[in-house]
Amino acid sequence: ALPGGFCEIEEDLIDTARRELKEETGLTDIPIELINTWGEVNRDPRDRIITAAYLAIINDMPAPVAGDDACDADWFNIEIRQRGRAKIQKDGKDIINSLYNLKLINRHGDEECTAMVSVKENAKGIIKERKIEVIDNNNIAFDHARFIIDAMLYIDNSIDQ
């Protein structure tokens, strides 16, 4: 699972993200940015959960620190390969449907997690209405693969601008 947890009643979302990052990885004083909010009714098998996903980018990887409710922590290299891309018509709209293979390999190379993720978005217009869905998953928390794909697409789009 990615670092994260629940917001305290008197806590802002960004403060929750910073607290959880510190508690579960030991990282502090790094810039973070909200990239998406996930709130489908049945997205989390535990309960009705709304997730605010934040992105952090760091230059150096300090030793991972597991704390709080995290039993262990590690750094993973991310490999993303676009497996396919097609333009389709749906409800009179041009939709771009992309399929991605995601692979996470820990820094020791002895743990690997994979997923296949579908990304559908409007081909035209400013509002893309991006829908990201996990098609296949191996050892990544239930829908966290789509958070990773979304973050990588966010970075790609930011670099392109």
Could you describe each region identified by the protein language model?
Residues 5-160:
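Unchanged
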